[in-house]
């Protein structure tokens, strides 16, 4: 009965207790026995457990007997809370009619809480506020209720007070889900339409598609048609996660479950696509999701050049489960063969790098992250540049446009001054500032390349960890940008090039040259480290040579003898400098990030 189905997500900022609440709900509904129950059941990746974050959306179909005696099917769809994975949140919400908005009763409303809640409201989802961690001594429910009403603008007087850790208030949450979240709309007799909300690769059965059936009924043995690429597949198995996979005889309108149909390639089962039947196809596909574009790019190079093929294989395997990871081969004079990879943000980059090192045993050199720039040439052609070393000659460029984001920062009022100073220093333009109780909401326009560098770390340090940030892409905007090159012994190192704003280019060049001088190990000859904009050198530092005391064996004696030995040493150093190769350590490539973070 479609009337007795409830589809809901849990949305929250990181660390507000979302995964713990999901664990308690699963336990309460008997989804897993106490023996099988472990912390963060839905976070299946080791990395998710260690960092205490959710990266991929997971689901659980649970049966709950309400106090009115009716048995309900509750489909819980877990969502990530980090800004990098906000597109996963919008995907999960599109399969739901309701969402639990979990807010930490001691921390209060934070930036991602606001962003995810607005996403839910835009998608027409019923939002139920829940105050978690009510058992903490620092919990202040009245203040947090006022914040929810002021900042988000939804009624929160009736918000439930719970503690996911102790299990207090869980039955009230389930009753509220049944009472307030509407049942799914959909017709079982209509042609099949199912929305793919996630897909991943399983080494035994191929691609597993997680779908929300909107209309119709789906049974094993039926021939499926994917509406975007018109590909046909035979449906082999359908089922639900409870949270372990359980096969079913059918999935009908309103339900969330999985389809296995022997697809070998994840590109064929695109998230946001509509699945229908070959014999009785639907006339219109469902509204999908916008294609997610990478925001941050970095070069990944193997330390050993013979590991290149292994790195390609590892990236391809990772892409099977992470469709938002983009990569293409690239060559660097300094680092050899590697890949230019596109990520959703810095956390995504960090996680991909860690998974490559852990799961695939790779030793990597990662170049400093950059963003995409639009370059308009004199002939009117627009090219997108994600690698600074590929920037065309300045003489052929009409203008360079950089990506600008709208950042929403929530910060306690005592740190507002420091945060405003930080944003202004990063070329930010204030758009809005709103006081809400003890919190202040600042809205800034910021260039994305300033945010990518070290903005997040600095924001946390100037606010003692209390500020939270959420951002979305706004537009490409013309800016006065130049390419800063680093030369080591008069050789340009392409992997160290970066694009900076002209106003701060000289200072950046000086700081970078000084940093390089500290990091490059001393050799037997002098090394010149220069920062250049075009042909113009803006900074120079020398790494002094190590030298042997060739006069140690001369006790007294003639000055000409000493001079002869020194001249001989000097000639040897000169020859060495001409043929000598300078090893650049990995730390030097990351120095670009820490340049102004002294």
UniProtKB/Swiss-Prot annotation:
It catalyses: GTP + H2O = GDP + phosphate + H(+). One of its GO terms (molecular function) is translation elongation factor activity. InterPro entries: EF-4, EFG_III/V, EFG_V-like, EFTu-like_2, G_TR_CS, LepA_C_sf, LepA_CTD, LepA_IV. GO terms for biological process: positive regulation of translation. Its EC number is 3.6.5.n1. It is found in: Cell inner membrane. GO terms for cellular component: plasma membrane. It is a peripheral membrane protein. GTP binds at residues 15-20, 132-135. Keywords: Cell inner membrane, Cell membrane, GTP-binding, Hydrolase, Membrane, Nucleotide-binding, Protein biosynthesis. The keyword Transmembrane helix does not apply. Residues 3-185 form the tr-type G domain. Belongs to the TRAFAC class translation factor GTPase superfamily. Classic translation factor GTPase family. LepA subfamily. Required for accurate and efficient protein synthesis under certain stress conditions. May act as a fidelity factor of the translation reaction, by catalyzing a one-codon backward translocation of tRNAs on improperly translocated ribosomes. Back-translocation proceeds from a post-translocation (POST) complex to a pre-translocation (PRE) complex, thus giving elongation factor G a second chance to translocate the tRNAs correctly. Binds to ribosomes in a GTP-dependent manner. This is Elongation factor 4. It comes from Nitrosomonas eutropha (strain DSM 101675 / C91 / Nm57). The gene is lepA.
């Amino acid at each position: 009965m479609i009337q007795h189905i409830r589809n809901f997500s849990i949305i929250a900022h990181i660390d507000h207790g979302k995964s713990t609440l999901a664990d308690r709900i699963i336990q309460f509904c008997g989804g897993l026995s106490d023996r099988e129950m472990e912390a963060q059941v839905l976070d299946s990746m080791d990395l998710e457990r260690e960092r205490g974050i959710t990266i991929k959306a997971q689901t659980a179909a649970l049966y709950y007997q309400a106090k009115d005696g009716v048995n309900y099917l509750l489909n819980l769809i877990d969502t990530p809370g980090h800004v990098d994975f906000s597109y996963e949140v919008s995907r999960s919400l599109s399969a739901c009619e309701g969402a639990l908005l979990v807010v930490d009763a001691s921390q209060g409303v934070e930036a991602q809480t606001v962003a995810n809640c607005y996403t839910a409201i835009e998608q027409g989802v019923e939002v139920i506020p829940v105050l978690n961690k009510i058992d903490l001594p620092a919990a202040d429910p009245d203040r947090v209720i006022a914040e929810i009403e002021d900042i988000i603008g939804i009624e929160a007087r009736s918000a439930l007070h719970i503690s996911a850790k102790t299990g207090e208030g869980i039955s009230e949450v389930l009753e509220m889900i049944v009472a307030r979240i509407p049942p799914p709309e959909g017709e079982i007799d209509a042609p099949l339409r199912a929305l793919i909300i996630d897909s991943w690769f399983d080494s035994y059965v191929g691609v597993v598609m997680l779908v929300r059936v909107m209309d119709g009924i789906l049974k094993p043995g039926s021939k499926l048609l994917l509406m975007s690429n018109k590909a046909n597949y035979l449906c082999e198995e359908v089922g639900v996660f409870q949270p372990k996979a359980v096969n079913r005889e059918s999935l009908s309108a309103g339900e969330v479950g999985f389809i296995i149909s022997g697809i070998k390639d994840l590109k064929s089962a695109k998230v946001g696509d509509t699945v229908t039947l070959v014999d009785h196809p639907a006339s219109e596909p469902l509204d999908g999701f916008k294609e997610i574009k990478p925001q941050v790019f970095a070069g990944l190079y193997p330390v050993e050049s013979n590991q290149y093929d292994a790195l390609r294989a590892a990236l391809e395997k990772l892409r099977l489960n992470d469709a938002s990871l983009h990569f293409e081969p690239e060559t660097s004079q300094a680092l050899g063969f590697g890949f230019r990879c596109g990520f959703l943000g810095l956390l995504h980059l960090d996680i991909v790098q860690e998974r490559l090192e852990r799961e695939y045993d790779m030793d990597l050199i990662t170049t400093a992250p950059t963003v995409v720039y639009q370059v308009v040439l004199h002939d009117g052609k627009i090219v997108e540049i994600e690698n600074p070393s590929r920037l065309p000659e300045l003489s052929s460029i009409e203008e360079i446009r950089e990506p600008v984001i709208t950042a929403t920062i929530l910060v306690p009022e005592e740190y507002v001054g420091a945060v405003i100073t930080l944003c202004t220093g990063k070329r930010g333009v204030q758009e809005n500032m709103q006081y809400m109780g003890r919190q202040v909401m600042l809205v800034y326009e910021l260039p994305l390349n300033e945010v990518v560098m070290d903005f997040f770390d600095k924001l946390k340090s100037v606010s003692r960890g209390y500020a939270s940030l959420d951002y979305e892409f706004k537009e490409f905007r013309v800016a006065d940008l130049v390419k800063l090159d680093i030369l080591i012994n008069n050789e340009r190192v392409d992997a160290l090039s970066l694009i900076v704003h002209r106003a701060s280019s000289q200072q950046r060049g000086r700081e970078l040259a000084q940093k390089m001088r500290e990091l490059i190990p001393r050799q037997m000859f002098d090394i010149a480290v220069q920062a250049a904009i075009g042909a113009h050198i803006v900074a120079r530092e020398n790494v002094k040579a190590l030298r042997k005391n060739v006069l140690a064996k001369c006790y007294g004696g003639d000055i000409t003898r000493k001079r002869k030995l020194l001249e001989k040493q000097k000639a040897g150093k000169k020859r060495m400098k001409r043929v000598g190769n300078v090893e650049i350590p990995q730390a030097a490539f990351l120095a670009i990030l820490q340049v102004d973070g002294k």
